[in-house]
From Swiss-Prot:
InterPro entries: Fe_traffick_prot_YggX (IPR007457), Fe_traffick_prot_YggX_sf (IPR036766). The keyword Cell division does not apply. It comes from the Bacteria. GO terms for molecular function: iron ion binding. One of its GO terms (cellular component) is cytosol. NCBIfam families: PRK05408.1. It holds the Pfam family Iron_traffic. It comes from Baumannia cicadellinicola subsp. Homalodisca coagulata. This is Probable Fe(2+)-trafficking protein. One of its GO terms (biological process) is cellular response to oxidative stress. Belongs to the Fe(2+)-trafficking protein family.
Length: 77
């Protein structure tokens, strides 16, 4: 069962994620502050970015780009 959290993306109480979806300290921050709904919105945006920019997720440069976009999308909207 998921807990309710205050989602900083949605700016309201919402259902939290069931598990940490991203590794490390950033992943913990996302788990504690980003709801399931907001994470799903990010996944849609992420797919769009990967396809439009033809990102290669094996490339560190492309993964770093995607991580920066994720932070911008989730925490600076």
């Amino acid at each position: 069962m998921s807990k309710n959290i205050y989602c900083v993306f949605l700016r309201k109480q919402a259902e939290g994620q069931d598990f940490q979806s991203y590794p490390g300290e950033l992943g913990k921050h996302i788990f504690n502050n980003i709801s399931k709904e907001a994470w799903a919105k990010w996944q849609q945006k992420q797919t769009m970015l990967i396809n439009e920019n033809k990102l290669n997720l094996i490339s560190n440069t492309d993964r770093n780009f995607l991580e920066k976009e994720m932070i911008k999308f989730l925490f600076k909207s």
